[in-house]
């Protein structure tokens, strides 16, 4: 409520995420919405692109956020989440089993203050990832031709 931002929860795994997102919306003092229908990738990318920042615990959420240059706070429940946050150069993460609301607020403050810089950093990460994907595609095609 400090920044007058509405929370939109995007469920990448609706069956698993609904209980957690519902509880979060009930606990909020501001507005909260849950998108738990099956959305296309393009639609999800649009929602994430339009966000000020994303709080995500699903790997695809982090990947989508990086690809559209949206700052992200990772909720770490698995080493793959920490690995992706490290790869993206993003320091803001909370443990899933004990997220601290004061730490979360501090992360949100830092992201709001430094959003442009963080987005530029994510743009570089996305560009490098696209280059690696292209190199891998060329390598895969060369292996198929052999």
Placement of each model-derived feature along the sequence:
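Active-site anion-handling motifs in enzyme catalytic cores
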Residues: 1-146
């Amino acid at each position: 409520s400090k920044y007058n931002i509405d929370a939109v929860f995007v469920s990448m795994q609706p069956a698993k995420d609904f209980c957690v997102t519902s509880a979060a919306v009930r606990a909020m003092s501001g507005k909260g919405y849950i998108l738990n229908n099956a959305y296309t990738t393009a639609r999800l990318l649009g929602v994430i692109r339009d966000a000020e920042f994303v709080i995500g615990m699903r790997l695809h959420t982090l990947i989508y956020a990086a690809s559209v240059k949206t700052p992200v706070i990772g909720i770490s429940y698995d080493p793959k989440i920490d690995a992706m946050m490290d790869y993206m150069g993003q320091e803001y993460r909370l443990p899933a089993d004990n997220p601290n609301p004061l730490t979360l607020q501090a992360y949100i403050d830092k992201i709001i203050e430094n959003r442009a810089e963080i987005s530029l950093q994510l743009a570089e990460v996305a560009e490098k990832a696209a280059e690696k994907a292209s190199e891998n595609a060329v390598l895969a095609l060369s292996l198929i031709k052999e």
